[in-house]
Amino acid sequence: IVENADENFGFSRYAEKLGRSANSFDELYEKLHSEKTFIDEITLELLEKKIKEIQPKLIGFSVPFPGNLYSAFRCAQFIKKNFPEIKTFMGGGFPNTELRDLKEKRVFEFFDFITLDDGELPIELLYKKICHSEQSEKSPLKRTFLLENGEVIYKNNSEKHDYKQSELGTPDYTDLPLDQYISVIEIANPMHSLWSDGRWNKLTMAHGCYWGKCTFCDISLDYIKLYEPISAKILVDRMEELIEITGENGFHFVDEAAPPALMREVALEILRRKLVVTWWTNIRFEKSFTRDLCFLLKLSGCVAVSGGLEVASDRLLKLINKGVTVEQVAKVCRNFTEAGIMVHSYLMYGYPTQTEQETIDSLEMVRQMFEMGILQSGFWHQFAMTAHSPVGLNPEEFGVIPSVKEITFANNDIEFRDKTGIDHSKFSFGLKKSLFNYMHGICFENPLQEWFEFKIPKTKINPDYIHDCLLEEENFNTKPNAKIIWTSAKPLVEFFTKSKKGNTWEMATLTFHEKTNVFSINLEKNKAIWLLETIDEIALHKNNKALNFNDLKSKYELNFDDFELFWYSKPIQTLKDNGVILCL
C-alpha cells in the first residue's frame, strides 16, 4: 500500500510525521493544499455520505495522536468547502498536549474551535452556542481557542465546573458497525498485538495519575495532575452496560496508571457478580501488587498489565522520581507472571545524564528479566523531552540544553542537547534487536556486544542479580486489617483415624478440585470442621463484607489456641499457594 497507493498509509496512524512536533503549520498547510490521496478520497466519500444523512450543525474531531492530525484537517477542509454552514471543532490528546500555545491563524480556516482537556463541558457549551439560536454571541466557553476579529484568542469564561467522573455515563457505541472492523497485527510484540488484535471496550478506572511525580511525564497538565477515581460499583455497572450494548466482554482500562486498591475492588465486584470478562490495563510496578492480589486480578479476568521499568537503573529511577527500584519491579513482575498475567514493560534510554555504561547495564537487567521469565513483552523508546514535563519546564536542573524555536502551532517535543554529549540514538537498533530475540525466548547467552556494531562497555551487573532479587524468606507477617477471601468451592471431605505409638486421633482429608489441578490437605477433624463452617463467612460469592485477619484470628481463638501456628502451617500454606485463600 505504501509503495503503490499512498506513502503516508499506516494501519493505526496516517501521515504521522506531519504532526510530530510541527512547531510550524507550513508543511501541514502545504500538504492540505496538494492533490488528495487515495485514502483521502475514500475518507471524504464516507464523510460526505454521513453529513448528507445526518445534516449536523456542529462536527467534532477527536485527535488523540499525531497520526490522526492530517486526516482531521483534511476532513474539516472538506466540510468548510462543501458545507460552510457547519461549524467544526477539534479536541483530544493532540491539542491537549501540543496546541496549548496556539497562535497560528490558518488553523481556523479548518476549525472554528479548538477545545482543551476534559471535553464534556466545553462541547456542551459549544453545542448551546451553535445549536440554540437564543444563545447570544457572548456565550461563555470553557478552555476553547477561536478566531475573533482576526486574532487567535483563548476563552475560559464559563463559571460551570467540569463534570465529575461518576456523572459522565457509559460510552455509547450504538451507531458503530462493530462487526465490520478488521483486526491487524502490525508487529510481533505480544502487548502491541493485544492492543490491535480484536476489539476492546474502553473504560477508565481513574482520571489522572495517583502518583503524578515522574519527571519525564506531563504532570503539569490536567489529564495527569487531576486525580479522581471512580467507585468499583459504578465501573462494573458500566462494564455490564457495555457488554449488553456491544455483545463483547473484553475491556481495556486506559488509565495512566490504575490504582492497585481500586483494581482490587473492581476485581472483587466482578467476581461477586459472576461476570465473565477479559481485561487489561496500565500500572505502576507498586509493591502493593502482592502475589495474592495478582491472583485475585487473574481470577477476575485480568490477562495483561503494562508498566514502566523505564531506564532499569536505580540511580536514574530515583532521578525520574518513579518511586520504584529494579528489585521491586522484578518482584512485582514475578507476582503477575506466577498468577498467569502477561507483563509488558515500557523501556527508556537516553534520559538526561544517562551514561553509556548505564544503558548497557539497563539492557543486562532487561535480559535477565526475560531469561527469568518474569517479563513477556517490552518496547524501547528514546527519551523525548516534552514541554509540560518537569524536565521540559526546568531543563537546567536535569543537565539538558533545549533548542529554542519560535512556536506558532504544535509545542510538545522539544529538541535538546544532553550535557554528556552522548548520541543515544546509536543504541536504538541494538536495543530493539536484542529485545526482539529475548521476547522470542532466544539468544540470552549472547554477549551484549553482539547486538551493537560499535564498541560498548562491559556490563557491571552481576549475572544473577535478578535471580537473587527474587530469593526471599517466607513472610510470616499478615496485616491485621487484611481481607481474607476464600475463592474456591467447598472441598470434598473424608474423615479417618490416625494412630501413632498407641495414640489415636480423628483427622480429615479435604480435597479441592480447581480449574487446573486437584490437591488435598489433612487437618485435625475439629479444625477441619471449624474451617468448613468458616468458609461461608469468607467465601467470595457469599458475603460482600469479608472477614479481616484479626476477625478470623478472634473467631479461631474462641475454640483453639495458637492461631499463628494454624495459619502458617503447611496445610493452610498449601491453600494459599493454590490461591484458595487470599490475603488482600
Can you name each region flagged by the protein language model?
Residues E16-K164:
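Glycine-rich beta-alpha loop elements in corrinoid/cobalamin-binding modules
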Residues F111, L275-T278, N282-I461:
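A structural motif corresponding to the C-terminal lobe/cap of the Radical SAM core domain
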Residues I1-G10, F416-L584:
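Radical SAM enzyme core and accessory elements
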Residues I1-P56, Q77, K81, D101-F108, ...:
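Conserved Radical SAM active-site core
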Residues P66-Y70, N96-E98, I123, V152-I153, ...:
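Flexible loop/turn segments at secondary-structure boundaries
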Residues K31, G150-K202, T516-S520, D577, ...:
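N-terminal [4Fe-4S]-dependent radical SAM core
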Residues P171-M342:
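Radical SAM [4Fe-4S] cluster-binding motif and immediate context
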